[in-house]
C-alpha cells in the first residue's frame, strides 16, 4: 500500500512540475510583462555635434511608438550626459513623457560615461527600494566616444554594479557605440557581446538605432527573451556603409 501511495505521489509531482515548466516556456506567448522600466543613458558630448536633431527625432519617435503599445505599465528614466550629468526623467510613466527638444538635448563637453552609468544604476536601485522592483529593467546606453571625464566611478566599480544587477535582478543592458570598439568596451563594462552593437555615427545610423531599439523594446515588453539578432540591422548598416 505504501509503495502504491508513494508511486502516486511521485507521479503527481512530475505532472505538477511539467505544468509549471510549460507555463514558464509559454510565458512570452501568453503572459506579457506588466511592469517594465526603460532606462536611457544618452551621450550629448561635443562629438555628437551635428546629430542633435536626429537624436531628438529618433528618441521621440521611438517613445511615441511605445506609447501606442498597450502592453502593461511602462516607466521611463532618461539621462543626458557629457562631463556633466542630467537626470531628465526619473521613473516617469511613459504616457506622461513630453517630447524631448533642443532645450534639453544640446551638445557640449567631454564624455563621462562611467559616471553616467554608475549614477544611473544607483538611482534606479534607490527608486526600487522605495517603490518596489519592476518586473523588468532595460538599460539602453548610447555613446559615440571614449570615456575621458569620469571622476566618481571607475571601470571596475561600474562593471561590478552591472554584473550584480544582471545576476540578482535580471536587468538587461544594451550598449550602442560609435567611433570606439563598442563590443570591446561593452565587454569591459560587463555587458555581453550579444547585447552590444557598433553603429555608424551619422544621420542614417542614428535613425537606425532608434528604429531597432523600438523593436527590441517591444520584444522585451512581450515577455520574450531578446534574441541575439536584435541588432542585425545596425550591424548590416555598418557592414554596408562602414564605421
Task: Label each residue range with its predicted role.
Residues 1-4:
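Positively charged n-region of N-terminal signal peptides that target proteins for export
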